[in-house]
Amino acid sequence: MRKEYDKLVRDRIPEIIRQDGRQCDVEVMPEDEYVQALKDKLVEEAQEAAAAGPEDLVKELADLYEVVDVLMDACGIDREIVVAKQKERRQSRGGFDQRLRLLWAD
């Protein structure tokens, strides 16, 4: 039974589908659609990581890292700049080490 997806998939997914004896069709996205599809995939993978149990969390975080890496490459963002910004924000706003939950503020 044919199922429509219309979403970004990993490069080997069509090959894996065909090896399973099924058919599929793909197209290469233009750059602007590709970047948006990566952003959509980032949300999808973050939701999957948030919903994952302990046994699947590492796999889902690996998928999330993959999308972040590819999105940075697609947007020409240097990893060192992101790490520097992470350190800057951690210093100015703190990390999450204290496990604080904000209950209210005036």
Question: What do the PLM-derived regions correspond to, one by one?
Answer:
Residues 1-106:
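Flexible "arm" and connector segments at domain edges
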